[in-house]
């Protein structure tokens, strides 16, 4: 059985930069203790004949084939640009050199 103290909840909340009241810390301590007890029950399961998996269901790659196609012409792309210079998009300076 795992006991989570109110102090442990407050310490973890502080590390996570979360504010919890005394009432919340007490409530969370009880709730987290119950959650840990439920998870600890999984350790009692016999998994000797269970295949290891990374997904609960079979997952297959459903992406299309990667086929190269002709892209847009530079002039066509730049005609929608708010500003361009030497055949490239011109953007406002955000840093000085």
Swiss-Prot record:
SUPFAM superfamilies to which the protein is assigned, alphabetical: Glu-tRNAGln amidotransferase C subunit
Primary gene name: gatC
Keywords for this protein: ATP-binding, Ligase, Nucleotide-binding, Protein biosynthesis
Entry's Gene Ontology BP terms: glutaminyl-tRNAGln biosynthesis via transamidation; regulation of translational fidelity; translation
Entry EC number(s): 6.3.5.-
Complexes and interactors: Heterotrimer of A, B and C subunits.
Function recorded in the entry: Allows the formation of correctly charged Asn-tRNA(Asn) or Gln-tRNA(Gln) through the transamidation of misacylated Asp-tRNA(Asn) or Glu-tRNA(Gln) in organisms which lack either or both of asparaginyl-tRNA or glutaminyl-tRNA synthetases. The reaction takes place in the presence of glutamine and ATP through an activated phospho-Asp-tRNA(Asn) or phospho-Glu-tRNA(Gln).
Similarity annotation: Belongs to the GatC family.
Reaction(s) catalysed (UniProt annotation): L-glutamyl-tRNA(Gln) + L-glutamine + ATP + H2O = L-glutaminyl-tRNA(Gln) + L-glutamate + ADP + phosphate + H(+); L-aspartyl-tRNA(Asn) + L-glutamine + ATP + H2O = L-asparaginyl-tRNA(Asn) + L-glutamate + ADP + phosphate + 2 H(+)
Domain of life: Bacteria
GO molecular function terms attached to this record: asparaginyl-tRNA synthase (glutamine-hydrolyzing) activity; ATP binding; glutaminyl-tRNA synthase (glutamine-hydrolyzing) activity
Organism for this UniProt entry: Listeria monocytogenes serovar 1/2a (strain ATCC BAA-679 / EGD-e)
The name this protein goes by in its record: Aspartyl/glutamyl-tRNA(Asn/Gln) amidotransferase subunit C
Family matches, as InterPro entries: Asp/Glu-ADT_sf_sub_c, GatC
Top EC class for this record: ligase
Pfam families: GatC
């Amino acid at each position: 059985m795992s006991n989570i103290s109110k102090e442990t909840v407050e310490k973890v909340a502080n590390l996570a930069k979360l504010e919890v009241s005394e009432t919340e810390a007490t409530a969370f301590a009880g709730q987290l203790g119950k959650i840990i007890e439920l998870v600890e029950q999984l350790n009692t399961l016999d998994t000797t004949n269970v295949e290891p998996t990374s997904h609960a269901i079979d997952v297959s790659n459903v992406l299309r084939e990667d086929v190269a196609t002709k892209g847009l012409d530079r002039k066509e792309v730049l005609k929608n640009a708010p500003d361009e210079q030497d055949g490239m998009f011109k953007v406002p300076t955000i840093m000085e050199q």
